[in-house]
């Protein structure tokens, strides 16, 4: 009986009354592979080791969004991308406030994303420094987040599933379809870049270890560096040069340069 119901639902969404048009995403495999840059960039810091689980979850949410989008559930896909960024914010907040972890696990209130961002901007020196030195990066991110929220909150007919079927008769369907794909690809790239940047608020090793001079003076870290291609596509070299001006990066660099090169 359950199998029959499942088959009926699948048929309804594939060809029947509730048909959802799937989206072609030629770069899906590339995005999935690129996310590995974040999962491999684990921090070894004892007081921030728990952040690894949060960044793994953020990466999972991005991967989920890519799958959901290709299946046609674009609003859920946009929501997953928004969540990937909020999860990253959450771990920065908890790393700065470890005493609040038990309350977070107990599902107590006070962990809304907006409140956590406000706290970090006003009280967490590393977070403040990064945002101050990379204003354009975060301004662009905010612009894309606002667009994402229109899909999540279903504002405007372009965020409706039914709009695609209603527009078929006047030949607007493909235009709407292409616009959703364009917006999603812009958002998935922004989400990957944002999560990667928030990871750099824990420690700068994913960037430090990209520098051969610094890498040869470094100890054996569990952290893997970001690839050149990853940085170029999702963060931008201009932004990385600005990031290198942060106190966090400079302190690590100075400490590592004090060590001799290793064979």
Residue ranges and their predicted role:
Residues 1-74, 79, 91, 101-263:
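A cross-kingdom marker of C-terminal helix-rich interaction/assembly modules
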